[in-house]
Amino acid sequence: MSENKSQLTLLQSIDYVREFHESFQLPVRNEMTAELSEKEMLLRFNLMKEENEEYLEAAQRGDIVEIADALGDMLYILCGTINAHGLQLKIAEVFEEIQRSNMSKLDENGKPIFREDGKVLKSNKYFKPDIKKILFQQEDAAM
């Protein structure tokens, strides 16, 4: 594998997008919230939807440049949405918990179970990610 001089971490990516949001006077929250205005929710959703559609079109054409562009834009918009919800300090732990949960989908022999379309199915070892614990563990500890 070649050494890439530009290996960004998730938190660095989120911080770059925070800088963009602050420079363009777009919302960045420091406290977690599920409450966005209807306008902001729809904007975030529509931006993600648009990039997903651009990815599909590029993939269907086999255009790797446009695929990379769409994926980069998806990540950028996702980072902005993380900042909009004030989840920037929790999202890495959330991702790690989802990873642990997803790996629990392997069966008792360490083998994946697939649906006909290729989707990975849950085994009897599966456990649901405990996102609530991650989001509120500091608050609970302070009480």
Where are the language model's segments positioned?
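Flexible "arm" and connector segments at domain edges
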Residues: M1-M143
